[in-house]
Amino acid sequence: EVNEQLVRAVTQAVVAQLMASGAQPQDVSSTPAPEGAGSFAGKTRMRPKHSYENAVRAQKGTDPKEIVIGVGAAFQTEITKTMSGIPLEEVLRNIKAGIEEEGMTSRVVKVLDTSDVGFMGLEAAKLSGSGIGIGLQSKGTTVIHQKDLYPLSNLELFPQAPLMDLDTYRKIGRNAAK
């Protein structure tokens, strides 16, 4: 059984053995990183965190021809490309084009409560005038959802984000609009 006492005893034994061998603690903050890797020494976040504190909450739509696309908080702020390197603005453009090809309209909302694609899709569907929504994670995973289904009982899930291309995203938009 592993417990706190055992962890402390092992830690003390390792430290005692290191001290007995003459090993001295070293400051690794200035140690050069392995070739090809960047050093994090003295670095802070690349960009400051984005605050949505004063953001206006999305309202439920009334247009029966509306499909809402729900994206996560990090979408195009912290993360700008899918896992396969496709720019998120292109992904959105293609999903919207697919929706428009079927004669429907689209609206994009940020879902700030969750990063789970199923819940993002459900929230988008609840905000949509048609009751159909698309959840889109920054990594590219996509789901088509309907407002009266359970969160994980979506209409369609596209988990193969690394294999998806822009044509696939366009087809997802078309499929959601049918």
Name the predicted role of every residue range.
Residues G38-K178:
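Conserved mixed alpha/beta catalytic, RNA-binding, or beta-rich assembly cores of soluble enzyme
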Residues E1-P48:
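Protein-protein interaction and targeting regions used for scaffolding, dimerization, and localization
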